[in-house]
A protein has these predicted regions:
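Cytosolic regulatory/linker segments at or just downstream of nucleotide-handling modules
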Residues: 98-100, 126-171
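Catalytic core regions of nucleotide second-messenger enzymes
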Residues: 40-41, 45-48, 78-92, 153-156
Length: 171
């Protein structure tokens, strides 16, 4: 399972504070995220600006990969709220196969590719502030363990019509 998180409102927030405060704030948030990744034995893939990417089930199999990223996401949401009430978090999650590997000649990077990665990214992009937006494959894995609200069918760029869900909490 792959998770993308975007600190919503960070761009407008950062236009009103000094660069030093921006770096400190982002470092505080990402440090908490790093600790949560360790707590859940997940894999931090990368950060890009105010975006954070996580996976579970790679490089080592984890039959609870979907639950792992969902529980992590719930704690990430609470963490951002506790650190800065002016910021929100949009999270997208999808589950399925990925290709993983190390690329590069100088700055090596472990990265992921594939449809699951693209769908998780789209779930974040089409999500809402303070919401965890999940794809149907993830929903099918965890539907008996969490509460959801139905997002209904949405048109997802590059994918067409998709049924998606907003995760509320653990049952």
């Amino acid at each position: 399972s792959v998770l993308f998180a975007d600190i919503s409102d960070f761009t407008s927030y950062s236009s009103n504070v000094s660069p030093k405060v921006i770096v400190e704030e982002l470092n505080n948030i990402f440090s908490v995220f790093d600790d949560l990744v360790d707590k859940y034995n997940a894999e931090k893939i990368k950060t890009i600006g105010d975006n954070y990417m996580i996976a579970s089930g790679i490089p080592y199999k984890n039959r609870l990969h979907a639950e792992t990223v969902i529980d992590l996401a719930l704690e990430m949401k609470d963490a951002v709220k506790n650190i800065n009430k002016n910021l929100g978090l949009k999270i997208g999650i999808s589950s399925g196969e990925v290709v993983a590997g190390v690329i590069g000649k100088r700055k090596f990077i472990y990265d992921l590719w594939g449809d699951t990665v693209n769908v998780a990214s789209r779930m974040e992009k089409y999500g809402k502030n303070h919401e965890i937006h999940i794809s149907k494959p993830t929903y099918e894995i965890v539907k008996d363990k969490y509460n959801f609200s139905d997002r209904s069918i949405i048109d997802v760029k590059g994918k067409g019509q998709m049924e998606t869900f907003f995760l509320k909490n653990r049952k």
